[in-house]
């Protein structure tokens, strides 16, 4: 607001004249809603937020022997966020005043179980990991918007004649199974293979299970030429991976919002989105390929990294607005 004032305008005058003696807004520029007195915004309007966050993580590991262990990890988080926005009576943008109070609550937990086995055979080292994971999130929101302020001295919901309540909630859960095998030979060759299976609650029943694998390897060729006064370290690496992802909640059906209007004896409502839901929605898949080389010279004083990376995505999930025709 101050940026739009002339350079010779005394800004102290705005500070001394932002409010009448009865507490209403001092109209200094003919009700311009875009240039409200900034001191009115600072001292009369109110905006507060509060966030409370609690989380906990626990883990239990049991080793059967030096090669095999089981591990259970669980964690949860609870986030509560409250917001209050007050626009006083007589404010040019909202002459009758407005008070909005919102609360948001997000609860989530994540539980994972893995079994890991490591061993060696001659010059080979290998490891196998199997596991499962459950991720759940529960989100709720509640907003009260009060308008038409009748008691101008008291900032409370009871001071307003008109009130609108908006509530929302959604849940989501992903159940996963995964496995990984890693191999190495003589500290020269390394390979990793993974496979993951996810089942999501936000996809259609016939498409809510999806798999995505990955494979990677590396070759430490500098081990073959040790000692070398020039090349301290050299590694060739390559990997291919596929990652699957699901959709946001409520993308499979039309959602309706009720209004305070009636048609005869019937309540009215409207569709809350301009997108037609896809009943055959599929998980999106992203394929990535990477190859590169890492080099270090002169006792690791100089390093060079070269990487080629390519990524392609299929069945991307996005909203496309419906034509008005």
Show which residues each predicted segment covers.
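Residues on the lipid-exposed face of transmembrane beta-strands in outer-membrane beta-barrel proteins
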Residues: 56-62, 113-117, 130, 179-183, ...
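Short glycine-rich loop/turn motifs
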Residues: 110, 174-180, 188-190
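Surface-exposed loop/interface segments of Gram-negative outer-membrane beta-barrel transport/assembly proteins
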Residues: 1-53, 73-175, 202-204, 221-288, ...
């Amino acid at each position: 607001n101050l940026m739009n004032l002339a350079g010779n305008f005394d800004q102290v005058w705005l500070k001394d004249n932002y409010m009448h003696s009865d507490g209403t807004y001092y109209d200094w520029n003919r009700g311009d809603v875009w240039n409200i007195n900034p001191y009115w915004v600072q001292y009369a309007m109110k905006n507060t937020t509060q966030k409370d966050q609690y989380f906990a993580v626990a883990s239990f590991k049991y080793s059967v022997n030096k090669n095999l262990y089981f591990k259970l990890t669980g964690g949860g988080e609870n986030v509560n966020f409250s917001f209050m926005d007050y626009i006083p009576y007589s404010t040019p943008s909202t002459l009758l005043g407005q008070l909005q109070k919102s609360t948001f609550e997000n609860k989530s937990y994540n539980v994972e179980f893995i079994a890991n086995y490591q061993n060696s055979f001659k010059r080979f080292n290998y490891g196998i990991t199997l596991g499962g994971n459950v991720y759940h999130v529960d989100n709720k929101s509640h907003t009260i918007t009060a308008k038409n302020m009748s008691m101008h001295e008291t900032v409370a919901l009871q001071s307003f004649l008109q009130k609108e309540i908006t509530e929302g909630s959604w849940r989501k859960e992903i159940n996963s199974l995964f496995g990984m095998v890693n191999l190495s030979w003589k500290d020269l060759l390394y390979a990793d293979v993974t496979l993951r299976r996810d089942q999501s609650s936000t996809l259609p029943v016939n498409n809510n299970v999806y798999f995505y694998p990955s494979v990677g390897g590396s070759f430490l060729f500098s081990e073959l030429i040790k000692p070398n006064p020039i090349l301290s370290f050299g590694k060739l690496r390559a990997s291919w991976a596929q990652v699957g992802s699901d959709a946001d909640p409520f993308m499979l059906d039309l959602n309706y919002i009720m209004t305070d209007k009636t048609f005869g004896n019937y309540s009215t409502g409207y569709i809350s989105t301009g997108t037609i839901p896809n009943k055959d929605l599929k998980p999106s898949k992203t394929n990535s390929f990477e190859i590169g080389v890492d080099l270090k010279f002169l006792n690791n004083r100089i390093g060079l990294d070269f990487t080629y990376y390519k990524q392609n995505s299929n069945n991307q999930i996005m909203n496309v607005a419906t034509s008005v025709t």
